[in-house]
Curated annotation (Swiss-Prot):
SUPFAM superfamilies: Kelch motif, POZ domain. Residues 10-26 have a biased composition (Basic residues). Core component of a BCR3 (BTB-CUL3-RBX1) E3 ubiquitin ligase complex, also named Cul3-RING ubiquitin ligase complex CUL3(KBTBD6/7), composed of CUL3, RBX1, KBTBD6 and KBTBD7. Interacts with GABARAP; the interaction is direct and is required for the ubiquitination of TIAM1. Interacts with GABARAPL1, GABARAPL2 and MAP1LC3B; the interaction is direct. As part of the CUL3(KBTBD6/7) E3 ubiquitin ligase complex functions as a substrate adapter for the RAC1 guanine exchange factor (GEF) TIAM1, mediating its 'Lys-48' ubiquitination and proteasomal degradation. By controlling this ubiquitination, regulates RAC1 signal transduction and downstream biological processes including the organization of the cytoskeleton, cell migration and cell proliferation. Ubiquitination of TIAM1 requires the membrane-associated protein GABARAP which may restrict locally the activity of the complex. The gene is KBTBD7. It comes from Homo sapiens (Human). Pathway: Protein modification; protein ubiquitination. The modification Phosphoserine is found at S29. This is Kelch repeat and BTB domain-containing protein 7. One of its GO terms (cellular component) is cytoplasm.
Length: 684
């Protein structure tokens, strides 16, 4: 052992006091951290205590206050009585805490009378105070919201708002908007407005006396909706039509507001094709009486004097001063509504680290869509995904082998994570049918056991359940929807699921040695099986038939078929070179029974060669350009493959690059798209 003098200078401690070592500070030993009495916690104590208090409440034991809930219009002594514990109510409910501890008159009374809440809602809320659980339904949710808002029960109030938001539909969206406005709930109001904007075209056609429509909105509510940029419409005429509908629903009372309402119409986006419609608009009595000058001024600014005079042969000279005011708003040139730029596009899903590509095969436009899987790419906890699209153009993505499920909202260009699935799987597929997401097939990622369980997710309730299992396990298969039935098909068998009876039925099998891809087109199932064989199944007749073979190329690496805007497309890619692959798109001619190369403009695609595709309606104005994923062929040939391997990709790319991330047999298994012909029709 070295002495102090023998220690090298570099290892000796420096001292500001002439080389003297600093005093050693006395610190407690390890045992000091474990002295004193041991503190233990009974993790079941709070739940057991609450359960016991609830049993006292049910048995009316040790209760110290009686709450009488009186129906509005009734006198004292006619209400329903609730025997409760002050401390429980005060601890759980801010309203009762103020009542019983704030020196109010009721704090000293054995009985308290309440008038502004109904007995049924109060019973549910008292149960919540004792249990932390609340039962919501369409019948009680609005009354519970009002009662919880009064009693300041924040959790119940927000649960009611979430319940209403998840049940928005065409028949109740305007009523929920009015409800949110009445209670000034900003989030619910925004969600209702977003739903109305997304379904504005359908709502503009509704006029049943049994349903609340856009005509039932107040002036302020209507103006807020008509001013939205996010209206999913193809023409500004739809906005004008709704404005007229609203005014004519109560012409006498609403007529004076006509000018303000029509200023929400973006006249600059009318075209010459709208001339007949505008001529009819100018002849409507409510327009001629209240706002002819406003509309004339806007049209003159939009079309100029020549076309304006053809629309309005004899301008109203007395309205020239007021029409000049409307020119200001027309000259602002507001943007197009969101729906005017909507397009059905082919979406490419590839490696988890990459964004998704949105491609129009006829115009060559390409954009990128964000991926929710990016954060998992480097951890390798997500190897692939399964995707499907709903009739409302929402894209659902299930990660593999994790339990995550996301939904993509095109108007917001964002992903929302939903409730976790019940099982981890790999090699599964997913489909959307009538408000439910179905997941089946694949195997357990740990044991490798093939799974027969079928998971079902309720979009409305954000909940999962297990439904009837498949009688045979599925791997290397496709899950597709035709009409109101679910079909699982592979090379050996095809099963049909009837959700109305929760049962699986056997169908005529494909009887092929290989299975590649399937999609729905014209209510029939098109399958690529033993390449280049294409077979078609007609569910109505229960028969298979063979059509023209798909184009065969020895260098083709990947085959995808999609239903794009009521056209059946075959998308192929070549074996990757320089980490890039050439993509070719063919359209099927049903009359001539042949595949036609439509002349894709993609060039060489720098993307995962094991991509899968589906079609969905998206909004290019919300997306980012995707040209960086395309390389001209001449540029690719000039690159050195050695330089590309060294400089173009990271270590992660070399380990799990697109050309080797999936085997040939697993490309279509691990990431399986859902293409529902009926769903695509809903996007037109």
């Amino acid at each position: 052992m070295q002495s102090r003098e023998d220690v090298p200078r570099s290892r000796r401690l420096a001292s500001p006091r002439g080389g003297r070592r600093p005093k050693r500070i006395s610190k407690p030993s390890v045992s000091a951290f474990f002295t004193g009495p041991e503190e233990l916690k009974d993790t079941a104590h709070s739940a057991a205590l609450l359960a016991q208090l609830k049993s006292f409440y049910d048995a009316r034991l040790l209760c110290d206050v009686t709450i009488e809930v009186v129906t509005p219009g009734s006198g004292p002594g006619t209400g329903r009585l609730f025997s409760c514990n002050r401390n429980v109510l005060a601890a759980a409910c801010p309203y009762f805490k103020s009542m019983f501890t704030g020196g109010m008159y009721e704090s000293q009374q054995a009985s308290v009378t309440m008038h502004d809440v109904d007995a049924e809602s109060f019973e549910v809320l008292v149960d919540y105070c004792y249990t932390g659980r609340v039962s919501l339904s369409e019948a009680n949710v609005q009354r519970l919201y009002a009662a919880s808002d009064m009693l300041q029960l924040e959790y119940v109030r927000e649960a009611c708002a979430s319940f209403l938001a998840r049940r928005l539909d065409l028949t109740n969206c305007t009523a929920i908007l009015k409800f949110a406005d009445a209670f000034d709930h900003h989030k619910l109001r925004s969600q209702a407005q977003s739903y109305i904007a997304h379904n504005f075209k359908q709502l503009s056609r509704m006029g049943s006396i049994r349903e609340e429509t856009l005509a039932d909105l107040t002036l302020a509510q209507l103006l807020a909706v008509l001013r939205l940029d996010s209206l999913d419409i193809e023409s500004e005429r739809t906005v004008c039509h709704v404005a007229v509908q609203w005014l004519e629903a109560a012409a006498k009372e609403r007529g004076p507001s006509a000018a303000e309402v029509f200023k929400c119409v973006r006249w600059m986006h009318f075209t010459e094709e709208d001339q007949d419609y505008l001529e009819g608009l100018l002849t409507k009595p409510i327009v001629k009486k209240y706002c002819l000058d406003v509309i004339e001024g806007a049209l003159q600014m939009r079309y100029g004097d020549l076309l304006y005079k053809s629309l309005v042969p004899v301008p109203n000279s007395s309205s020239s001063s007021s029409s000049s005011n409307s020119l200001v708003s027309a000259a602002e040139n507001p943007p197009q509504r969101l729906g005017m730029c909507a397009k059905e596009m082919v979406i490419f899903f590839g490696h988890p680290r990459d964004p998704f590509l949105c491609y129009d095969p006829y115009s060559g436009d390409i954009y990128t869509m964000p991926s929710p899987l990016t954060s998992f790419a480097h951890t390798k906890t997500v190897t692939s995904s399964a995707v499907c699209v709903s009739p409302d153009h929402d894209i659902y993505l299930a990660a593999q082998p994790r339990k995550d499920l996301w939904v993509y909202k095109p108007a917001q260009n964002s992903w929302q994570q939903l409730a976790d699935r019940l099982l981890c799987r790999e090699g599964m597929d997913v489909a959307y049918l009538n408000g439910y997401i179905y997941i089946l097939g694949g195997r357990d990622p740990i044991t490798g056991v093939k799974l027969k369980e079928v998971e079902c997710y309720s979009v409305q309730r954000n909940q999962w359940a297990l439904v009837a299992p498949v009688p045979h396990s599925f791997y290397s298969f496709e899950l597709i929807v035709v009409q109101n039935y679910l079909y699982a098909v592979n090379s050996k068998r095809m099963l049909c699921y009837d959700p109305s009876h929760n049962m699986w039925l056997n169908c005529a099998s494909l009887k092929r040695s290989d299975f590649q891809e399937a999609c729905v087109f014209n209510d029939e199932i098109y399958c690529i099986c033993d390449i280049p064989v294409m077979k078609v199944y007609n569910p109505a007749r229960g028969e298979w038939r063979r059509i023209s073979n798909i184009p065969l190329d020895s260098e083709t690496h990947n085959y995808q078929i999609v239903n794009h805007d009521q056209k059946l497309l075959l998308i192929t890619s070549t074996t990757p070179q320089w980490k890039k692959n050439r993509v070719t798109v063919y359209e099927y001619d049903t009359r001539e029974d042949q595949w036609i190369n439509i002349g894709t403009m993609l060039g060489l695609l720098q993307f995962d060669s094991g991509f899968i595709c589906l079609c969905a309606r998206v909004y290019p104005s919300c997306l980012e350009p995707g040209q960086s994923f395309i390389t001209e062929e001449d540029d690719a040939r000039s690159e050195s493959s050695t330089e590309w391997d060294l400089d173009g990709f990271s270590e992660l790319d070399s380990e799990s690059g697109s050309s080797s991330s999936f085997s040939d047999d697993e490309v279509w298994v691990q990431v399986a798209p859902q293409r529902n012909a009926q769903d695509q029709q809903g996007s037109l």
